[in-house]
Amino acid sequence: MASQGTKRSYEQMETGGERQNATEIRASVGRMVGGIGRFYVQMCTELKLNDYEGRLIQNSITIERMVLSAFDERRNKYLEEHPSAGKDPKKTGGPIYKRRDGKWMRELILYDKDEIRRIWRQANNGEDAPAGLTHLMIWHSNLNDATYQRTRALVRTGMDPRMCSLMQGSTLPRRSGAAGAAVKGVGTMVMELIRMIKRGINDRNFWRGENGRRTRIAYERMCNILKGKFQTAAQRAMMDQVRESRNPGNAEIEDLIFLARSALILRGSVAHKSCLPACVYGLAVASGYDFEREGYSLVGIDPFRLLQNSQVFSLIRPNENPAHKSQLVWMACHSAAFEDLRVSSFIRGAKVVPRGQLSTRGVQIASNENMETMDSSTLELRSRYWAIKTRSGGNTNQQRASAGQISVQPTFSVQRNLPFERATIMAAFTGNTEGRTSDMRTEIIRMMENARPEDVSFQGRGVFELSDEKATNPIVPSFDMSNEGSYFFGDNAEEYDN
């Protein structure tokens, strides 16, 4: 782990920068989102989208996906070497929705990737601006986190579907860099490592030769990223064991699953950032806002303020509830899929309900869905208060590892207890404490047994009025301590499958 002196904030990771002071960070993050906004405005001109169509979140997602696809070097190379029927490796596109005679029409567009790259670079002072691309990836990832359950993926790797609160960022592409690694949950990292180990078990050449050497480096790097998320010495020591294993196999998979379970109570530090759809930045740029001059932060008041003044629309299917669609997007914008619903509801100023009670499907519309019956409505993305985002995991100081309900990875730095079903979690830890990691396992189990669901996390931290931009008067909410609020609890959400 880098020593404290060289640790970069996640804005620095986000913008690929070295250590900067707060003003420089705000400026470089501002430059990044401003570039996204300028690109979006230009794309709306290219595609002849009117104001309303440009504010449609489905159009925003198509445009975002086009630029991500245009810059996906590895996939572009693969497509050129493996020409498949009907896929032009040099082109990218997707559905654009336009309003015609009071109805929504779907129009499939196709663009040259190099043309898209040209527009993107032009909007970003001639640079590739990989930070902006990563930012868009994280927004898509946060949207997936709020929309889908990863039960099937968890079960496939031998994990328990109730560990879904550890799965933040599970759909992020590998190329998402340091900013992407910062927002990945413990479960996501464990799952990536298990997949890798399984390949090594099934394919004996996986760790061999020149390629195997690169694979090994990637494996150790992922282990280090995961180790850096853990906050207790025993968990980190177990990660060292996994990383140093000569020939990773089932013992390592066991250790990793054990660690993932332990993270339900001894939570890892996972970053949270508000990444908004490109059209939101586009709206601000079009109205003359200068992000770079004003500065911007992904973890403070700025995204809340931006959403207070942005009107974004969404297509709505016939039996969907627009308020529920709004909740889904609000959660995605604030990276709050795994936050306690009591906290989210308080900040939003409207009840945030569990996924299973939402009458809405995902935001994206499949190509075979009937447009005749599609309507559109305004997304309500405003909030009553704002709060600072956290990456601490909310562990209380006395044990640096506190109570965490099956299913909370706190997003906001707001005082509350983190209720959890100790019986449910501890049941998973019966027996197996032998083998080379026995002392660490025993130590981890002891810490978990000492964690109390009523312990208060984020002591003294509160939410702020939207007029309080300097965060001077924290309002500390009081929550019903017994009532837990988990979003995917008892759920029937759709699966995310690529």
UniProtKB/Swiss-Prot annotation:
For the region Disordered, what residue ranges are annotated? Answer: 1-21
Q: Which GO terms describe its cellular component?
A: helical viral capsid; host cell; host cell nucleus; ribonucleoprotein complex; viral nucleocapsid
Q: Does the keyword RNA-binding apply?
A: yes
Q: Which UniProt keywords apply?
A: Capsid protein, Helical capsid protein, Host nucleus, Host-virus interaction, Ribonucleoprotein, RNA-binding, Viral nucleoprotein, Viral penetration into host nucleus, Virion, Virus entry into host cell
Instruction: Give residue numbers for sequence motif Bipartite nuclear localization signal.
Output: 198-216
Its BP terms in the Gene Ontology are: symbiont entry into host cell; viral penetration into host nucleus
Please provide, alphabetically and separated by semicolons, the GO molecular function terms listed in this UniProt record: RNA binding; structural molecule activity
Q: How is it modified after translation?
A: Late in virus-infected cells, may be cleaved from a 56-kDa protein to a 53-kDa protein by a cellular caspase. This cleavage might be a marker for the onset of apoptosis in infected cells or have a specific function in virus host interaction.
Localization of this protein: Virion; Host nucleus
Q: Which HAMAP family match?
A: INFV_NCAP (MF_04070)
Q: Which family does it belong to?
A: Belongs to the influenza viruses nucleoprotein family.
Indicate what this protein is called per its UniProt record: Nucleoprotein
**Organism, per UniProt?**
Influenza A virus (strain A/Gull/Maryland/5/1977 H11N9)
